[in-house]
Regions:
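FAD-binding subdomain of flavoenzyme oxidoreductases
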Residues: 1-61
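C-terminal substrate-recognition/cap domain of FAD-linked oxidoreductases
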Residues: 58-195
Length: 195
């Protein structure tokens, strides 16, 4: 710009500038609201039946009282690509990653156990973090791990809307054996209230 603008972003509007992947401005002043520190626990649950673990994870994501930063589900064989964590999984298991407030982790583990899920990984998110930590395997990191294992994989990101389970099943029917699901539960436009 010939005449630089002063743009003030507050609250949710600031999120628009977080992942812009390039220099698009110079910050001249930053104000941050502080909140109490939350200690997080990294939990990984497994089950050999996709519907069992998916339904449990979806239900868990909709429970508003949990303070969590991450809820991710991986269809088998995606977890087999995760060097550093693969030793915690059995070969045919689907997995769910949860990053949850440490003081609520026992409740999450009890719910998972009641649903027949296996707890495969239970570690605090240390300060500073020490690998392996589950955030290194989620979002676009998942694709990088998969491509390291199999460079022929194609990646497609999709937003399914509110009837996402039916749309996933439709993909499996139309493309049997060709679609593997990696699901990130987000606050976004859903009814879920994530921290």
């Amino acid at each position: 710009e010939e005449e630089p603008q002063l743009v003030k972003l507050e609250g949710p509007d600031a999120i628009k500038a977080l992942h812009t992947y390039g220099t698009n401005g110079i910050m001249v002043e930053i104000e941050m609201r502080l909140a109490p520190k939350v200690d997080y626990q990294q939990l990984i649950f497994c089950h050999k039946d996709w519907n069992t673990i998916f339904d449990w994870t979806d239900d868990f994501a909709r429970q508003d009282h949990f303070k969590r930063r991450l809820i991710t589900g991986f269809e088998n064989p995606i977890p087999q690509y995760f060097k550093g964590l693969v030793k915690h999984f059995e070969e045919e298991e689907h997995v769910t990653f949860i990053l949850i407030s440490t003081d609520q982790s026992d409740e999450a583990k009890a719910l998972a156990e009641a649903a027949g899920l296996r707890l495969a990984y239970d570690r605090p998110l240390a300060d500073p973090p020490r690998p392996p930590y589950i955030t290194d395997y989620t979002w676009n990191h998942t694709t990088l791990w998969a491509l390291r294992a199999d460079p022929t994989i194609t990646y497609l990101q999709a937003g399914f809307g509110t009837d996402y389970k039916a749309k996933m099943e439709m993909l499996w029917e139309k493309f049997p054996g060709e679609s593997l699901m990696h699901i990130e539960w987000t606050a976004g436009n859903s009814k879920m209230n994530q921290e």
